[in-house]
Regions:
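S-adenosyl-L-methionine-dependent methyltransferase catalytic module, highlighting the catalytic core
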Residues: 120, 134-135, 143-255
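Class I SAM-dependent methyltransferase SAM/SAH-binding core
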Residues: 76-116
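Glycine-rich SAM-binding Motif I of class I
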Residues: 71-75
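Conserved alpha-helix/loop element of class I SAM-dependent methyltransferases that forms part
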Residues: 37-59
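A short acidic, Gly/Pro-enriched loop at the edge of an enzyme's catalytic core
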Residues: 124-132
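Conserved class I S-adenosyl-L-methionine
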Residues: 60-69
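N-terminal, positively charged/glycine-rich alpha-helical extensions of SAM-dependent methyltransferases
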Residues: 1-29
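Hydrophobic adenine-recognition pocket in adenosine-nucleotide-binding enzymes
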Residues: 138
Length: 256
């Protein structure tokens, strides 16, 4: 049975990020037709390493989904073995939808909790640490992606999974070094993109900012610099979403 509140949310803008299958067989209207393939590929790429990290934790394993949107991956984390999952997102509408869908599926609200919060406001001293931290589709919408990764590192006691759109700037960039006619070659680089207000760009995590988009070298470098060890780039199997197979989007994991 689909509640009246959920039906109203399904009929209201903006369109949804995740293709939840509801009890009556219906699905929300999506922002883009490719999204189901994107999410399926993401889940396939991370499931095994996430399960391993949850199994390796002491006591009841916990996870946090930073930039959780409507809570699809928060629910996956629970199905993969997390005893408690906390989802945070900067948008009220996303958290409202996440709670409605959680309740629709009959999930204990104490097992999957949701909170409206900015990633930069999170503090391990108050929230604690987690066996698994997800940052899926987030950092390339931020003005301070490295600061966000530092916070993610502080929250991680096991594994952190970061997924991002990346640039195709794989050749080194030439930069001056402060001396006339002297230069250095830098493998890591970030592209700047203006994100319009959220009302006009519903996929963006936060509108009205200059977002920084890394190339793969910059993403790996940032993970290492903020303190993750054994940083690994996960590869997508052939036959799955081409953005991942072709390297337009990458998934990187690091350990505490």
């Amino acid at each position: 049975m689909v509640s009246d509140d959920l039906r109203r949310e399904l009929a209201a803008p903006p369109a949804w990020m995740y293709p939840f299958e509801l009890a009556d067989g219906s699905r929300p209207p999506l922002l883009h037709h490719e999204l189901p393939s994107v999410h399926e590929t993401r889940a396939l790429m991370m499931e095994r390493v996430v399960q391993d990290a949850l199994e390796a934790g002491d006591g009841e394993p916990t996870a946090i989904d930073i930039g959780c949107s409507e809570g699809w991956f928060a629910q996956r984390l629970a199905s993969w073995g997390a005893a408690h999952v906390h989802g945070v997102d900067v948008r009220d509408v996303n958290i409202r939808r996440a709670k409605l869908v959680r309740d629709h599926y009959g999930v204990d609200p104490a097992r999957i909790t949701f909170e409206v919060a900015d990633v930069l406001s999170l503090d391990p001293d108050t929230s604690g640490t987690f066996d698994v931290v997800l940052m899926i589709g987030l950092i390339y919408h931020l003005e301070n992606p490295i600061g966000a990764l530092r916070i993610a590192r502080g929250l991680t006691r096991g594994l952190c999974v970061v997924e991002a759109q990346v640039t195709e700037q794989n050749a080194p960039i030439t930069s001056g070094v402060g001396v006339t006619d002297e230069y250095e070659q830098l493998d890591a680089s970030w592209a700047a993109k203006f994100e319009p207000a959220q009302d006009f760009h519903p996929i963006a995590s936060h509108g009205g900012v200059i977002s920084l988009i890394p190339n793969l070298a910059a993403l790996v470098q940032a993970m290492e610099v903020v303190g993750f060890r054994d940083v690994i780039v996960l590869e997508a199997p052939s036959g799955h979403n081409r953005q991942y197979v072709n390297g337009q989007r990458r998934m990187v994991v690091g350990y505490a």
